[in-house]
């Protein structure tokens, strides 16, 4: 039987930290410590060294790839004799709950927007495309929130299709982690960006994963470059529990929070509840739906202890 390592060796070029860091070349570090502090996720210790060693080489790679796509578009439009439509380059970032997808997305947005070739970089999370809380309850999906069936896929695909087509003023629904629900009558307007980053649990899912066996368009069909943020499950579970404890004294303390009833839990109670949530929801979703899509990514960022990147895999 072919091992996972041999599959990775066939599909990907592997780089350790020092090898990857060398590929930065002369790309300058444009972030300072206060700016980085605003981009960090809960319970993450992201340093400027991590940005320099991991994210600057990735920023350089993406800039080269986006530039090549833009040049190809110019050639095609010249051949067709048409005015080039403004269509964004779409980057997706997938991975488990608590792996740090949102931080990766924010860092890349900040770095990519510094390149003169593509100054406008928008970021959208798929959380806004979860069915509203009332609809999840009606469908009996509240305990499967984050699973593929808990998303309004028709709305999500229509959104990314309109963005990819170069349409102006495309609306993306917003999500509140306080109310644990989609925000009514509010949205993020996407106005023909140079690059769109879309971040979510299931953005690498394809028609092959359809439960009904019918081929249909998915987010991955519209993506130009995909990134998967990876880590061992024991680390993911630990990070989830640590984050839950942080939220208990932070967001959960807000009386409007859907999880306010967790705010006064003792440490042991909070850890037990968080572990149960992982074992019953997040862990199964990871194994069934998220992790199986990993090897579809163009690039895999593998994290080790303390959220530090240990290896980068780049598809050949």
UniProtKB/Swiss-Prot annotation:
Gene3D superfamilies assigned: P-loop containing nucleotide triphosphate hydrolases
GO BP field: coenzyme A biosynthetic process
Binding-site residues, ATP: 95-102
Pathway annotation: Cofactor biosynthesis; coenzyme A biosynthesis; CoA from (R)-pantothenate: step 1/5
EC number(s) from the headed UniProt entry: 2.7.1.33
Catalysed transformations (reactions): (R)-pantothenate + ATP = (R)-4'-phosphopantothenate + ADP + H(+)
Annotated compartments: Cytoplasm
InterPro entries named among the record's database cross-references: P-loop_NTPase (IPR027417), PanK (IPR004566), PRK/URK (IPR006083)
Family: Belongs to the prokaryotic pantothenate kinase family.
Name of the molecule in the record: Pantothenate kinase
Annotated organism of origin: Shewanella sediminis (strain HAW-EB3)
